[in-house]
Amino acid sequence: MTIASSNGSNRAQSPLITDLAEAINTRPDRNTHNGREPELHQPSEEDMESMMGAVRSILVGVGEDPEREGLLKTPKRVAEAMRFLTSGYNQSLEELLNGAVFDEGHNEMVLVRDINFFSLCEHHMLPFMGRAHVAYIPNQKVVGLSKLARIVEMYSRRLQVQERLTRQIAEAVQTILEPQGVAVVMEASHMCMVMRGVQKPGSWTVTSAMLGVFQEEQKTREEFFNLIRHQPAFF
């Protein structure tokens, strides 16, 4: 069994999946068309100008003056922030992994817990943020520990709903490693529930995705849940 934080691994590279590019581009989830990731373009300067214009319109719409001193640079700042917060659209698993898949012969649970993340709700474009716990039971192959955190980050930096985000992370790990099973739990606070709507600060949403042995075997699920509840003594 391996338990880690979101720190990286220094193993020597030994890529195993030769057709990874094809494998990771074909996953059935709600962001795909016919099982394939949609074609997305890199944001251009024209796109930036369009976003800046949209922000100016919003400022006018709420009764503000976009020409006053404090707001002069706001459209550009918001556009740059949105580009960063949605940068996961312009990343791929193939580039993210960079060959960091290794044949270790390990067959006990690997868990990286307490991965901090932030994302944007696709309904209101307000933030939600929290912690992710990602585990898998290898079938010979393992991945650099930091890559699990980067997978969480890549899918989080898109317009999301927490349920889909949880499932996408689990399916990504399943695709790249073909392990015996994958488990993902995400705990998050949603600003669309805190700042508007029901206005309930302190509420948390918990979602899970279980694949393979984590779905099929209660004992394996219980081990995972016990590990993510346990507080490490050395912190």
UniProtKB/Swiss-Prot annotation:
CDD domains, per database record: GTP_cyclohydro1 (cd00642)
GO CC list: cytoplasm
Enzyme class of the recorded protein, top EC level: hydrolase
Transmembrane segments: none
Gene Ontology MF terms in the entry: GTP binding; GTP cyclohydrolase I activity; zinc ion binding
Family that this chain belongs to: Belongs to the GTP cyclohydrolase I family.
Subunit structure of this chain's protein: Homomer.
Identification of the protein by name: GTP cyclohydrolase 1 1
